[in-house]
A protein has these predicted regions:
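FIC/Doc superfamily catalytic core
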Residues: 1-255
Length: 255
């Protein structure tokens, strides 16, 4: 009789035992490559995999690109190490410190491990002012801490609101996407990785949600990415809830 394998215990076990070629290895490389690539990192998938598996650099690459890739691996591990802890300001700031540690910049606005000093924008979206960021993040965390049954609607809503706050000078998208991983794993949901190929669809979905235009595109993107993860879980023979849900059904639940 086969033993049921669940994703979170497998990730924790493979991390602890430094297992090569498993789902932990794949998720680390896929997540770091795509999340960094969306933000302009120029490392190839093979370079990303090489850094993770050998802790060395193959060929020539930007120092900052390498640091951000290695740092993302540490952030992924931090999500696993703190899986029993709720999302908090402290955890969010520590993720940012790990992500941006060692990055070379002469930008006066660069603050590592703490909130932005100056206002910023995301396209045409006006983000939260620096002096209001801490209160906005606390309010967002507090609101979601009272939700008993978290589903993909909640994950998308939290992500869109976090990105609208845009609490840091840089790294907001990567931190936000790492938090979706934490929310999914903590709530027994299949996590997802937004691929670089989905970037424009993903950004359009964020923008539509943030201006209150419509809410389907972002969740559709998350659900599509979740299907890709389910295929990987099938390959590695990891069990998961096979209940199918559509973006429209999630919206109807809120009505």
């Amino acid at each position: 009789m086969s033993v049921s394998r669940q994703l979170l215990p497998v990730l924790l076990s493979e991390k602890k035992n430094a297992v090569k070629g498993g789902i932990y290895n794949k998720m680390q490389v896929d997540f770091a490559y795509n999340s960094n690539r969306i933000e302009g990192n120029c490392l190839t998938y093979e370079q990303t995999r090489y850094i993770f598996e050998t802790h060395t650099i193959g060929g020539t690459a930007s120092v900052n690109d390498v640091f951000e890739t290695a740092n993302h691996f540490r952030c992924f591990d931090y999500i696993l190490d703190t899986i029993d802890e709720p999302i908090s300001e402290k955890l969010i700031k520590e993720l940012h410190r790990k992500l941006k540690s060692g990055i070379i910049t002469d930008d006066d606005s660069a603050v590592v491990g703490d909130y932005k000093k100056y206002p910023n924008t995301v396209g045409e979206i006006t983000t939260t002012l620096p002096e209001e960021v801490s209160g906005a993040v606390r309010a967002l965390i507090e609101e979601f801490s009272h939700r008993n049954a978290v589903d993909m609607y909640d994950v998308a809503e939290f992500h869109a609101e976090f990105e609208k706050i845009h609490p840091f000078y840089d790294g907001n998208g990567r931190i936000g996407r790492l938090l979706t991983l934490k929310m999914c794993l903590q709530n027994g949901m299949v996590p997802f990785i937004i691929s670089d190929l989905m970037k424009h669809f993903y950004y359009a979905g964020l923008n539509e949600w943030q201006i209150g235009q419509k809410y389907t595109r972002l969740k559709d993107g998350f659900l599509d990415a979740q299907d890709d993860m389910k295929a990987a879980l099938d390959y590695f023979r990891i069990d998961y809830d096979r209940t199918e849900v559509t973006a429209r059904e999630l919206i109807n639940k809120r009505k």
